[in-house]
Amino acid sequence: MEHYISLLVKSIFIENMALSFFLGMCTFLAVSKKVKTSFGLGVAVVVVLTIAVPVNNLVYNLVLKENALVEGVDLSFLNFITFIGVIAALVQILEMVLDRFFPPLYNALGIFLPLITVNCAIFGGVSFMVQRDYNFAESIVYGFGSGVGWMLAIVALAGIREKMKYSDVPPGLRGLGITFITVGLMALGFMSFSGVQL
């Protein structure tokens, strides 16, 4: 149990997808103008990562890994295309389930669900899971923790950007300029976790 808690803390803070690996930056910067929309996208990313990482773990270990299907057959060259296909399928299934059973939540998320398909933080989580050879339980914890870490980062950035509306920002830095500086300072803050050994 202690191993899973340390993996969760590690994936949220020490190896934060957005602020340590800088994955998912397109949506991270584009959607972080308001806390409400950032939170909605963050929840969707948590759900997709929590499902996509373990499902791709099963696909990799049961189909793609060397000697998984047949002795002497290695399908690991199909990793990228298979993982992207599984992520896209999961996002479509999630979109249909939300549309059918939770219409208010589906309408609130709107365009954010299809955007998750191309969010490289999702693919990064799956790739790290394979690279680090996590088992199924570890992949669930890692997927959830990575999603929570990404959501924490985007909600924090959105809160800072909302407060910066009332600040006197120099004209040359308004918009993305000050946002990049803010993200850099946030990443420096998260670097302090890199010394923590779990």
UniProtKB/Swiss-Prot annotation:
UniProt GO molecular function: oxidoreductase activity, acting on NAD(P)H, quinone or similar compound as acceptor
UniProt keyword list: Cell inner membrane, Cell membrane, Ion transport, Membrane, NAD, Sodium, Sodium transport, Translocase, Transmembrane, Transmembrane helix, Transport, Ubiquinone
Enzyme Commission identifier(s): 7.2.1.1
One Gene Ontology CC term in the entry: plasma membrane
Transmembrane regions listed in the UniProt entry: 11-31, 39-59, 77-97, 110-130, 140-160, 176-196
BP GO annotations: respiratory electron transport chain; sodium ion transport
Claim: ATP-binding is one of the keywords in the record: no
Entry function: NQR complex catalyzes the reduction of ubiquinone-1 to ubiquinol by two successive reactions, coupled with the transport of Na(+) ions from the cytoplasm to the periplasm. NqrA to NqrE are probably involved in the second step, the conversion of ubisemiquinone to ubiquinol.
Subunit-structure text: Composed of six subunits; NqrA, NqrB, NqrC, NqrD, NqrE and NqrF.
Name of the protein this chain belongs to: Na(+)-translocating NADH-quinone reductase subunit E
Organism: Vibrio campbellii (strain ATCC BAA-1116)
Gene that this sequence comes from: nqrE
